[in-house]
UniProtKB/Swiss-Prot annotation:
The keyword Nucleotide-binding applies. Its cofactor is K(+). GO terms for molecular function: ADP-dependent NAD(P)H-hydrate dehydratase activity; ATP binding; metal ion binding; NAD(P)HX epimerase activity. K(+) binds at residues 56, 114, 150. This is Bifunctional NAD(P)H-hydrate repair enzyme Nnr. Binds 1 potassium ion per subunit. InterPro entries: CARKD, Nnr, Ribokinase-like, YjeF_N_dom, YjeF_N_dom_sf. Residues 203-461 form the YjeF C-terminal domain. Its EC number is 4.2.1.136, 5.1.99.6. Residues 9-201 form the YjeF N-terminal domain. The gene is nnr.
Length: 464
């Protein structure tokens, strides 16, 4: 049995909408799948559907329509809140299905369908769901859970109280928690709802929507503190990476560059906090100063704009020993990352060959103990086991500096997310920002234009 985490399933659901496979169609296929599994086991009978406020309830409403020959009742534990659930409930009402608000006095059905919370549940159940779970478990009805039993954590398999299903009908792939809590899942049926296998391996707006985090009760620094270490022969690269991190959501970005170019880098924007480290180049003698800066930041981005500096790689290798998270680009890319550091490497083909030779990219990621985001017309992202491909972007992005922007975006996401998901989200967002630029300027835009397009690209991702 193949598995997919609840997060990756939600990402895939959003990406399907972007690729033209609507959530409405997926819900239709899911609800029909539930009905099919019921009708494999029963020819007739009374069915009571317990529906929550989200799309799990929507799946239940669709199932009601497909249960031909059954006496179906729908109980709303909460009013539907999603557009799809509202629409499918309205169809049920128009079709004449009895719809009642709240819990029944008793369960007198042959079959109960749990379409209450699905994969959205975490922690202790609130009312009326807690009472509903008790009622369902105490009944003699055949119990069918939609996607996962209500109360069960879909990933960890943990629960305090959960529907003890005789049958769980899940979609696309099983959720990991189903294998860890067989005592409440019963038989597990995995239904194909029409998602092409290739979609699971493509980056899209769903990746961005889940990696970009904004907390209503946050204070400065909560959304991430990034340290950019680079510069030397080039001044624009560290500035672009720093600005990209800010535009992608990081609260604080410090740019550490050689003293010789500090004023030039600072002149790019009043939003930059620029620290001079070393004189003409960043060298091993500056390590202690850099290590103090590392302690005050969540993520280190290193390598852009360094140019010819034989000591820089050694500086990076030492910094990684005290660093929890890092994004390494250009001259900062190393072939092995210590276990204490969660790391994204962002080479283009030439840089990849320089560091890893002709090693296949998945094997290189395993060897490096890092996520590799291999830049190209189609970006490849892998941690050695998982692989995703990004197809956003256009030929205008061959202009210099777009890779620096990508590194900054990846760092912003990595502040509050894991390396693989951050890299996937960064690759798509960077390309989408390029597509936003193309709509405005054609192919003739710069990396500065790309940075300024990041907020609009984020809004587009969140609209799906």
């Amino acid at each position: 049995m193949e598995f997919i985490s609840s997060r990756d399933m939600q990402i895939l659901d959003t990406n399907c909408e972007y690729f033209g496979l609507s959530r409405m169609l997926l819900m239709e296929n899911a609800g029909k799948g539930v009905a099919e599994e019921v009708m494999k086991r029963f020819y007739e009978g009374k069915v009571q559907i317990f529906a929550g406020s989200g799309n799990n309830g929507g799946d239940g409403f669709v199932a009601a329509r497909h249960l031909k020959g059954f006496d179906v009742e729908i109980f709303l534990l909460s009013k539907p809140k999603t557009e799809l659930a509202i629409k499918n409930l309205e169809i049920c009402r128009k079709a004449g299905f009895p719809v009642k608000e709240g819990l029944p006095e008793e369960i007198d059905a042959d079959i109960v369908i749990d379409a209450m919370l699905g994969t959205g549940v975490r922690g202790r159940l609130r009312e009326p769901y807690s009472t509903a779970v008790k009622m369902i478990n105490e009944s003699d009805a055949f119990k069918v859970a939609v996607d996962v039993p209500t109360g069960l954590d879909p990933d960890s398999g943990s629960y305090e109280e959960a529907v003890k299903a005789d049958l769980t009908v899940t979609f696309h792939k099983a959720k990991p928690g189903l294998a860890k809590a067989r005592e409440v899942c019963g038989e597990v049926a995995v239904k194909d709802i029409g998602i092409p296998e290739s979609f699971e391996n493509l980056c899209g707006p769903g990746d961005v929507a889940f990696s970009y985090k904004r907390y209503e009760d946050a204070h400065k620094g909560v959304h991430g503190k990034v340290l950019v270490v680079g510069g030397g022969d080039y001044t624009g690269a560290p500035a672009l990476a720093s600005l990209a991190a800010l535009y992608a959501g990081a609260d604080i970005v410090t740019t550490a560059v050689p003293m010789a170019i500090r004023k030039v880098v600072a002149s790019f924007s009043p939003n930059l906090i620029v620290r001079g480290v070393g004189e003409e180049r960043i060298e091993m003698k500056n390590l202690e100063e850099l290590e103090e800066l590392v302690k005050r930041h969540d993520v280190v981005v290193a390598g852009m704009g360094v140019g010819e500096n034989p000591e820089f790689k050694e500086v990076v290798e030492e910094l990684l020993k005290s660093c929890k998270k890092a994004v390494l680009d250009a001259q900062g890319i190393v072939d092995s990352v210590p276990e204490n550091c969660e790391c994204i490497l962002t080479p283009h083909r030439g840089e990849f060959g320089r560091v890893f030779g002709d090693t296949e990219v998945q094997k290189a990621a395993l060897k490096a103990k890092a996520v590799i985001l291999l830049k190209g017309r189609e970006d490849v992202i892998t941690d050695g086991s998982r692989v995703k491909v990004n197809r956003s972007g256009n030929a205008g992005m061959t202009v210099g500096g777009t890779g620096d922007v990508l590194a900054g975006i990846a760092a912003a996401f990595l502040c509050n997310d894991d390396a693989f998901h951050s890299a996937c989200a960064a690759a798509f967002l960077n390309g989408l920002a390029g597509d936003v630029c193309f709509e405005k300027f054609g192919y003739n835009y710069t990396a500065t234009d790309l940075v300024k397009a990041i907020p609009e690209a984020i809004l587009r991702c969140k609209s799906f």
